[in-house]
């Protein structure tokens, strides 16, 4: 068997071309995986078109490091994952942007989910069992309503992100749960793959934890990446050849080498709804501003967050690591980490008395809005969807956060609602109102991003300027086009497009100013807390636990090595065939083996 026989060219490139060529027409709904949560609704789409006409030039396509790991199971059916945002309007756009950023790592790191496409304003209702069709209600002979079998497209518009389907039937959390002493019987229905792994076999989990932490270290150095919600349910476990070894070469102050046996399994990190990457700088804040009181820094880098979360959860999971290691690990993590920081012991998040920026804003806005609407004897759907309003207007914030004036919030809200109500009165359902407002915000954001001056309220708004008039004319055309989706014969009498446009930008400035103040306070608190730790980097946090998750191993002839070189940003592989080399490496200290193999074999 040659070295190249271990490399599989999976269906990703084929499906990517199908998505580009045919879009959603090439797929049908298969099943839901996750129902409506704060992270959205997730399910599987099945490809229904033939790929015979799709030509993939393997020499031209970029080879992913995953292709060196995958066991080709000759699966004929092809699937993709869809994700529809629910509570946070732009969640899918954010997660897709992070995934695109992380895809830069795919040539030399196999541990992240790959993106396909982002589709805006899809008719999909995540509340339905099948989000893409709705059963039509009709009156029967009685006064009650009944459901017919007739189907129609949902009236709800949603953004939808498409990602690769990961062929995995277990998570790292499930694997840990069956290895915890005294918790052999779990609530999880154990699948056949998990049942094959003995409860006493800690080597597999130790290796997975080690691979996971090294992947995070590399992603941090390459992209300033933080996941922000790295519990072990967000780590899928995939199979590779049992005698596969990972040989890492990466830079962290100096060149680092690591050699890990996989025992036939490797991790893939999913769910980037709260994540951050340096590629988001210069773009809009699409995550919403929830949960930042828990320590989430989804708009800037914090190297300790993910390791703090992983180590805290691991410490309180009861995981054994191996014989007589659990108590020593718990004692170490408590002494070095948990006792130094205000940490929630279940989640690893920050324990503070602060409330999130979104709650602060909503509390302030809600009082004014209720009083204002009562004074003019009107109602607005924003009274119910105030968090969505904050998130949508907040999406005009361009990262990084800047200090902005917040003094005119109340006056600006009054101007905004006076103009918005002239539009809202023509719209029936709340879902359509969200659709209209979301598209208005999209237009303004497009103007902001196309402007050379990214600070929002300053761009192209000089009184009587040509650019202002052009901007407002295009804005007016956009609103006409959007309202045509609502109905015919709509006349927006008295709508002052300039006041409406400027009020939204000024609200965004106010929101950014409030968030900036909160963020400065949060950074100051975290800096003081982190100063109490002995570890001064995420690498030192990894080095603290590395002895617990490292395994003794012996190499054999025929062992397969995947070389993830993040310095040269390439992946290569080799098969160890020389018995003399095997004996030489086995006689070496474990810390020296990776560098020796890399320099002698690659």
Curated annotation (Swiss-Prot):
Protein name: Uncharacterized protein 098R
Assigned protein family: Belongs to the IIV-6 098R family.
SUPFAM superfamilies assigned: Protein kinase-like (PK-like)
